[in-house]
Amino acid sequence: MKSLSLLALAAIAPPAAVAAVVDHQVPFENRPVQGLPEKFLIQLGPEQTRWVTEDEKWALKMEGVNFFDITAEPDRGFSVKSHERIQVSFPSEVKHQTELAPLLEQLSKDNMRQNLVHFTSFHTRYYKSETGVQSATWLFEQVEEAIQDSGAAQHAVKVERFEHSWGQFSIIATIPGRTNKTVVIGAHQDSINLFLPSILPAPGADDDGSGTVTILEAFRVLLQSEAVQQGNAANTIEFHWYSAEEAGLLGSQAIFSDYSKTGRDIKAMLQQDMTGYVEGTTKAGEVESVGVITDFVDPGLTEFIKRVITGYCTIPFVLTQCGYACSDHASASRYGYPSAFVIESEFKRSNQRIHTTGDTVDLLSFDHMLQHARMTLAFAYELAFAEL
């Protein structure tokens, strides 16, 4: 997810680790040169691109700079032409409180805790690591188990791997509806320790283990609805767990690029990245809330999400911004699909221990994660039955 500043990381990590990262920086080049370290083309803004090494990627993230890695598709800018954008009218009110009431009661903090404790037990979920593949395999099995336990497999509900060249695969679970119009809920499964990504532990409890288990729990409970499970909803619902978000939104870009090329009808995408940290808000003497991102998102979808939070959560929302390419919703936007993002708090109050060994389960509130799970479940159900 979002990047910590070098100053914030220095307060958490040993000085030698900071020095090691800074010493690896080299001057930026305009293009890759034979014989030098491999370069990647990143996009730091709608009109700003740069060739960088992998070490320079991590140094930028330590300075709080977000980016797309667009090496695979350098000609695709963030801002697509207006006629290429998917235009969707979202519901003006929530309508399924009666159907959702018994489902909301089934959301379990204990399930989320148990899953997150196991998910963070992998040494790292770095997208190029062996344990990153192992963690993805475990997560895939949990999604598969939720489908089997609900009996939804007999109704064509399925989970598939979306393979990538770097090892760790993304995961896509599909709940078919009566049409191919599709609503996507996403989180990223990878983690990173910015000091030595391929070596040091990266528990990634909040970033983004919290979002991963939040949407997993919403997925599990959504399958308890016979109407959804049996394909009676108007729209198809997909749950995505992306690989390689930390490296420049690589996994989500690959998926939405594929969807664009194959003409998939994606009506909405909601990202859940960092859903568990509330201490920054409460220590500041502010009211616990969820943060609705307002920059680089679809305004209509964001307005609908405000209605969902008001209708189904027991805490309010606060409007906030996270900057360019701050999480996987930006990949959906890059390919013309309406996207939105809800984070754990106002952005400045969010977890400052991400990307270090200090991003651990004990710092998180499962009561707060339950609020995100309620929102995710309600969002999925409401849009499943909406005319989009």
Curated annotation (Swiss-Prot):
Details of cofactor binding: Binds 2 Zn(2+) ions per subunit.
One GO cellular component, as annotated: extracellular region
Disulphide connectivity of cysteines: C322-C326
Propeptide stretches in the record: 20-88
Gene Ontology MF: a single term: aminopeptidase activity
Glycosylated residue positions: N180
Keyword DNA-binding included in the entry's annotation: no
E.C. number(s) listed in UniProt: 3.4.11.-
Top EC category: hydrolase
Coiled coil: none
Stored Pfam families: Peptidase_M28
Secretion signal span: 1-19
Cofactor requirement: Zn(2+)
Domain of life: Eukaryota
Binding site for Zn(2+) 2: D207, E246, H355
Predominant location category: secreted
Subcellular location: Secreted
Keywords, in A-Z order: Aminopeptidase, Disulfide bond, Glycoprotein, Hydrolase, Metal-binding, Protease, Secreted, Signal, Zinc, Zymogen
Subunit structure: Monomer.
Role, per record: Extracellular aminopeptidase that allows assimilation of proteinaceous substrates.
Family, similarity comment: Belongs to the peptidase M28 family. M28E subfamily.
Name of the protein in its database record: Leucine aminopeptidase 1
